[in-house]
Amino acid sequence: MGILGLSKLIADLAPQAIRESEIKNFFGRKVAIDASMCLYQFLIAVRSEGAQLATVNGDPTSHLMGMFYRTIRLLDNGIKPVYVFDGKPPDLKSGELAKRAERREEAEKALKAATEAGDDAEIEKFNRRLVRVTKEHAREAKELLKLMGVPYVEAPCEAEAQCAALVKAGKVYATATEDMDALTFGSTKLLRYLTYSEARKMPVKEFSYEKLLDGLGVNNREFIDLCILLGCDYCESIKGIGPKRAIELINNYRDIETILDNLDTSKYTVPENWNYKIARELFIEPEVANADAIELKWTEPDEEGLVKFLCGDRQFNEDRVRSGAKKLLKSKQSQTQVRLDSFFKTLPSTPSATNAAKRKAEEAKKSANNKKAKTSGGGGGGRGRRPK
């Protein structure tokens, strides 16, 4: 679910925190990607990119197709992705998971009715709602990434929290996900729409954590309380409080405890046994693997391994898989060259340093020409050429 209404609130009150960019502008960046979010996008995608969407046994392959071709696209644009997979959800998320199960049951009933009515649009809509990422989807995706030479991380708990930890540790530049709670976990940069297909023509939206805090007039602790008021996965929110009222309350009272002390309970209903304090702690101290101990390595692809894994029962086109493997190898080699070039890059010159360098070059040139003039003439009284 993420954080309800946060994206619009930032756009309204802190627009300077959002920047739209083309994918090519992230050349050379390492990015931690929410793998489950990607797999979900790929599973509901209507169009394939030339591969079959199911095996001979009817098992879906759109998640593998999407992972393969979108990852190649990222690498083609000079981006170094690392995929982060969800672990066990925190106990506090059980309420949200129960609600999702209820919505799934409702979608199944609605799908049955739409099928009986022959309503294709409704059938497609409810089929999408029934899509979920399984452990088998994740296992296959990890195997594919390993063959592609792309690193992945298995989070002990929430993938967004682990992504944020990698960003804060300086291992990667940003978190790429559609869930805004990556910001609540403290990711200094959030990228939305990075893994969307080129056909959708969606610019990448980059959110700056520092700028949004400044624009909203809050610190990181107050921002977490704001997100809890807006509505998160870990606890209920106060009924009747929307985004505008939530930011007003945070700006006036600075934390949920003081808000509750001053809240008109005849107007707003506070959830019984509200676990906002535990939710707050989950955002402040999430269960994550030590980011400093995680080593990220991008290696050369295993072309034959990819062909064996994707072709055959999974029915991917072998020529396209081999072509993709060659693109992976090419991007790996070009990224190595970029790193070598950047190693020798000099610092930007200041105006005074630039002028001094010019003077030194001119003096050296003049000295060389003078020396040449003295030695270039014939014997005796020959004259040298005038320095240019």
Swiss-Prot record:
One of its GO terms (biological process) is base-excision repair. Residues 1-104 are annotated as: N-domain. Phosphorylated. Phosphorylation upon DNA damage induces relocalization to the nuclear plasma. Mg(2+) 2 binds at D179, D181, D233. GO terms for molecular function: 5'-3' exonuclease activity; 5'-flap endonuclease activity; DNA binding; magnesium ion binding; manganese ion binding; RNA-DNA hybrid ribonuclease activity. Its EC number is 3.1.-.-. Mg(2+) 1 binds at D34, D86, E158, E160. InterPro entries: 5-3_exonuclease_C_sf, Flap_endonuc, HhH2, PIN-like_dom_sf, XPG-I_dom, XPG/Rad2, XPG_CS, XPG_DNA_repair_N. It is found in: Nucleus, Nucleolus; Nucleus, Nucleoplasm; Mitochondrion. Binds 2 magnesium ions per subunit. They probably participate in the reaction catalyzed by the enzyme. May bind an additional third magnesium ion after substrate binding. Residues 336-344 are annotated as: Interaction with PCNA. It is an enzyme of class 3 (hydrolase). Keywords: DNA damage, DNA repair, DNA replication, Endonuclease, Exonuclease, Hydrolase, Magnesium, Metal-binding, Mitochondrion, Nuclease, Nucleus, Phosphoprotein. Residues 122-253 are annotated as: I-domain. Belongs to the XPG/RAD2 endonuclease family. FEN1 subfamily. Interacts with PCNA. Three molecules of FEN1 bind to one PCNA trimer with each molecule binding to one PCNA monomer. PCNA stimulates the nuclease activity without altering cleavage specificity. This is Flap endonuclease 1. It comes from Drosophila ananassae (Fruit fly). The lineage of its organism: Eukaryota, Metazoa, Ecdysozoa, Arthropoda, Hexapoda.
